[in-house]
Amino acid sequence: MHRTHHCAQLTTSQLGATVSLLGWVDTIRDQGGIIFVDLRDRKGITQIQLEPHENAKLAEQVKQLKPESVIGITGKVVRRPAGTENPALPTGEVEVVASSLEIHNISDTPPFPLDDAGGDKVNEDLRLTYRYLDLRRPKMRKNLQVRHRAAKSIRDYFDAQEFIEVETPALFKSTPEGAREYLVPSRIHPGQFYALSQSPQQFKQILMVAGVEKYFQIARCFRDEDLRADRQMEFTQVDVEASFVTREDIYALFEGMLKKVWKDVLDVDIPTPFPRMAFHDAMNRYGVDKPDVRFALELADFSELFKNSAFKVFQSTVAGGGVVKALNAKGLADLTQGELKSMEDTAKSLGAKGLAFIKVEGGEWKSPIVKFFTEPEKAELTKRLNIEEGDIIFFAAAPWEKACAILGRLRLESAAFLQKRGKLTIRHDDWQFLWVIDFPLMTYDEAENRYVATHHPFTAPVPDDTQYLDSDPKKVRGQHYDVVLNGMELGGGSIRIHQPVLQKKVFEDVLKIPQDVVESRFGYMLKAFTYGAPPHGGIAFGLDRMVALLCGTTSIRDVIAFPKTQKGQDLMAQSPTPVTPRQLKDLHIQTVMPE
C-alpha cells in the first residue's frame, strides 16, 4: 500500500477523495458494530470508520486489531455527522470510511500508557527500558522535532555567516588534567590508549592556524563524570571558532544565532544586545556566576557595618579578611521548622557552621543574635534590605566566595518556597539572557597548592592584566565569557592565546605543569603556533541543554532520543556489558574488579 497523505493532512478540502493512510492504532472504539479507529502517524491523527458487517474480510481483520498495531487503510474522506466533530484535532471535521485494511504488525499490550498524562506518571526507568514506545508519546515526538528545527536553524545561521562545518576526530589523546575521560585501548599499539574527545577545543584552534578562519561543528563529546539532570556521559555541543575576532564580535555573532533559533522554533523575538555582568558583580549580588535574574532577592554586603560588631562571629570574620553578607527573603517569615532545617543543612553542606537569621514578626526582630546589634546597625540593615513585617533575613560570615555561594543557594531555595506559597511567580518562558564576563583567569587550588585555569589553559588574559601573571595571578582577568539564561549556563567561550611564548608561560610558569608534560600533551599545538597562528576566539554550548529550555523540560534526557540513566546505563540495550576474554586479549588488557 502506498501512502497518499499523512494523517494530519485531511480536511474538508479532501471530501470525497480516496486516500491511503499508514500508521499506528491509537485507540479503538466499538459503537454498535461500527468500529472507529484513531490512526496515528508522525504528523497527527485521523479517525477511521470500519464497517465489518459489510465486508467479511474486514470483519476478520478487525478482530485482530489492538492499540499500537501498525496498519494501512484505503477509504473515502467524508464529513463527520453533525455533533460528532472533534475541534481538538486539525482533522476533526472529517473521517475516512475504510474500504480495505492491511495489517502490517499486531502489537503486544504496551507496559505503560502512551499518552502524555499517563506516561508522565510512569517511572523513568520503565520509560527508558521501552524507549521506542516512550518516543511515540506526543510530547517526546515534539521534543525531537524541536531539536531538529533548532539544529537546522543553527546550521542555516552559520552557513549564512560564511562559516564552514568541519568534523574533528572523536578519538583523541588523553589530557588527564580536565574531567575524567573515556579511554579506548589500541589493539595495534599495545599498552597505548586513545581518549574519546571531551571537546574539539584543540582541533578547532589548529583549524584557525590552518587558515579556516570560520569554523563550526555540531559535535559529539564524551565525559566520564557524575550524572545529573543536566548532564550526560555523551552529549552534543555546538562548537564555534573564528579568526581575527574580538569579544564584541563573538557576542554579536552568538546573540544573532540565539535570536534566530528562538524565532524559528518558538516564534519569539528576544531583545539584543544582551546585558553584561562582571563575574565579581554576579557573585556579589546573586551568589553565583550564572544568576537567574527573573526575580530580585539580591545579596548585600555588610562587612564594613559589622567590622566592630559586638557579635564576635561577624567581627572576627571581617578581621580575618572574610565578609558578612545578608539576604532578605521577603515574606518568608512563615518558614516551617522543617523548611528552616533544610536551609540550614544546605548552608552547612557549603561549609557554613550554622545558619544565622532574623525573623520579623509582630513588629519584632526575632533571633538570638539581635541582642548584639546596635540601633544604627539595625537601621542600616532595614534601609538597605528594605526589611518589613513578614521578612526573614539570612546571614553568611565567611571568606568572600564561600559567603556568596551559601547565600546564592539560599536565594534559590527561598524563591522555590515563595513560589510554593504563591508569593512569587517565575515563568519558564521569561527569557532573560545575559553575558557574564571578566572571570578570573586563574583560581587557586588549596589542595594542590597551585593555580589552576578557571576555565581552560588556552584562555587569553585581558591585556591590561598580563603584567600580573608572574607577581599576582589572581588579579588577572581572562577574556572568557559565559552566556546565561534563567540561571543556567547555556555556553561559554573565550579569546584564545595565540602566541606560543605566552601559551608556554601559562602552562609552565603559572600552572606549574612540568616542561616534559607540556611537551607530551601540547607540544604539537605549541609547534603549530610557531607557524603564524592568527588571533582567534570562539564559543561552545550544549545543544541538549538549549533544546531542553526550548521544550520547557528540566532534564536533557527528555530531548535526547536514547539517553543514559543517572547511573550511566542504557536500559533499553542493556549496556554497559562484559566482554569476552578473547576481546580483552586482543586489546592486551585485563580487568581487575574492585574489592
From Swiss-Prot:
Query: Which PROSITE patterns does the record match to this protein?
Result: AA_TRNA_LIGASE_II
Which coarse location class applies to the principal site listed for this UniProt protein?
cytoplasm
Q: What does the entry list as the binding residues for ATP?
A: R223, D224, E225, Q232, E489, G542, L543, D544, R545
* A Gene Ontology term for the protein's cellular component: cytoplasm
Ranges in a coiled coil: none
| Residues engaged in binding L-aspartate | E177, R223, H455, R496
For the protein in the UniProt heading, the enzyme class is: ligase
Against CDD domains, the record matches this protein to: AspRS_core, EcAspRS_like_N
Does Protein biosynthesis appear among the keywords? yes
GO terms of molecular function = aspartate-tRNA ligase activity; aspartate-tRNA(Asn) ligase activity; ATP binding; nucleic acid binding
Tell me the PANTHER family matching this sequence.
Answer: ASPARTATE--TRNA LIGASE, MITOCHONDRIAL (PTHR22594:SF5), ASPARTYL/LYSYL-TRNA SYNTHETASE (PTHR22594)
- What's the family? Belongs to the class-II aminoacyl-tRNA synthetase family. Type 1 subfamily.
Listed name of the protein: Aspartate--tRNA(Asp/Asn) ligase
Q: Which organism is it from?
A: Opitutus terrae (strain DSM 11246 / JCM 15787 / PB90-1)
